[in-house]
Amino acid sequence: MAANRNLKQVRIENSSPAAPLGMVGGGGGLKGLRGLETENEAAAMALVPGKEGGDEEQEGGFTIDIKSFLKPGEKSYTQRCRLFVGNLPTDITEEDFKRLFERYGEPSEVFINRDRGFGFIRLESRTLAEIAKAELDGTILKSRPLRIRFATHGAALTVKNLSPVVSNELLEQAFSQFGPVERAVVVVDDRGRATGKGFVEFAAKPPARKALERCSDGAFLLTTTPRPVVVEPMEQFDDEDGLPEKLMQKTQQYHKEREQPPRFAQPGTFEFEYASRWKALDEMEKQQREQVDRNIREAKEKLEAEMEAARHEHQLMLMRQDLMRRQEELRRLEELRNQELQKRKQIQLRHEEEHRRREEEMLRQREQEELRRQQEGGFKPNFMDNREQEMRMGDMGPRGAINMGDAFSPAPAGNQGPPPMMGMNMNNRGTLPGPAMGPGPSMGPEGAANMGTPMMPDNGTVHNERFPQGGPSQMGSPLVSRTGSETPQPPMSGVGTVSGGPGGFGRGNPGGNFEGPNKRRRY
């Protein structure tokens, strides 16, 4: 039976006139089975279970699929499927109690208190529990009518101050952190608008107590708005069965109040006066409640406005803090960047200094190497230059640097030294052949001391304009011997070195720069 409990066969005895079937369509399932009016226990057992096979029974019955009694998303064996059975016989056994509900599916919880005559049983779905309650309530069992009600949900909580955007799913998800939730519902009005209230049903009492304590001590928020929910134990009301007449206790007060039937009080009577005072009291209560509700609503609106302003200010503060944090990060990054640039600059300066030092070292080494080379080969170039100078002075002809004599510069007398040439003392030329210049015989026409052959014979008819005509001739031929003492001539500067040439090897100026009162050129 446990393997095939989702498929039950209920056979209704056609011969029983007191067992009609009432089918109420609601939500796609069977709402209730009514019309079972039995007088004894045998009549209460008129509904017998059918066969447990998977095939439908065709003989005087119909098949009920228990799965069809579960609504979409409904959980099975919840607290809402729990029934309270009162006025039980004291000698009833657990097997008899189960057999009483076995036609409505496999129960999961069975509890019997024989001393007080009540018990609890939990069925698979709410619909099956409603069917069992409708069928078995008032049934006579061992001369006792059974009283069946839905058991009070001990793990249900009322949730208030809900936001309009909270749904059933969000409410269940929020309270699932405390324990398994069987059902969570947000209460709405007739137009489907949220009333700000709801309830949550847990599977057991410990999670419900935990949720109640946590929400009472702290502030439990369901949305972004800092609006905490208010959790309270759920008040249990029976708004289905109510209080039937058969359950009323027939006390003295009951009989006294039932003496007068329902009626309207007549104006001017005692009843009308006090009835009016009761109505005034109710009206005052209503007005005060409305005023309290209005004050609470205004306080809530004011609090919401302050909360919005404070949240805006809080967001601005967070943005400022974030901006300051980012500025601090940027400043730190800028400092790191500046430090890195400073390090790179220092490294670059060190590299440049090292490069400059290496260049200076290379230049100094090059200079030292050049100086060393000059010191090693310095004497040989000087010797060669002197040798070349001597060779040039010995090989030059009549128009050379030494044979510069002409009609205007005759050779000196035997006791007369050669004139200095641009500061060069001819007497100091130790390398020239022949005796030193001075008194004595003059050298030949090609000699170093002969200043060249005369360009004009000295016949005494041509005189130099630079000198007085009465003076002795100084332009004579070197071959003519001179007698007597003659006054030495002043040194001539007409013969000199070529500008830029080595000393002693220059050629005479063709134009001749003659010092004296007359500086015209002579040709």
Curated annotation (Swiss-Prot):
SMART domains: RRM. Its main location: nucleus. The keyword Coiled coil applies. Residues 497-514 have a biased composition (Gly residues). Residues 81-153, 155-236 form the RRM domain. Residues 282-376 form a coiled coil. It comes from the Eukaryota. Residues 471-487 have a biased composition (Polar residues). InterPro entries: NOPS, Nucleotide-bd_a/b_plait_sf, PSP1_RRM1, PSP1_RRM2, RBD_domain_sf, RRM_dom. One of its GO terms (molecular function) is RNA binding. Keywords: Coiled coil, Nucleus, Phosphoprotein, Repeat, RNA-binding. Residues 465-523 are annotated as: Disordered. GO terms for cellular component: fibrillar center; nuclear speck; nucleus; paraspeckles. It is found in: Nucleus speckle. GO terms for biological process: activation of innate immune response; membraneless organelle assembly; negative regulation of DNA-templated transcription; regulation of circadian rhythm; regulation of DNA-templated transcription. It holds the Pfam family RRM_1. RNA-binding protein required for the formation of nuclear paraspeckles. Binds to poly(A), poly(G) and poly(U) RNA homopolymers. Belongs to the PSPC family. This is Paraspeckle component 1. It comes from Gallus gallus (Chicken). The lineage of its organism: Eukaryota, Metazoa, Chordata, Craniata, Vertebrata. The gene is PSPC1.
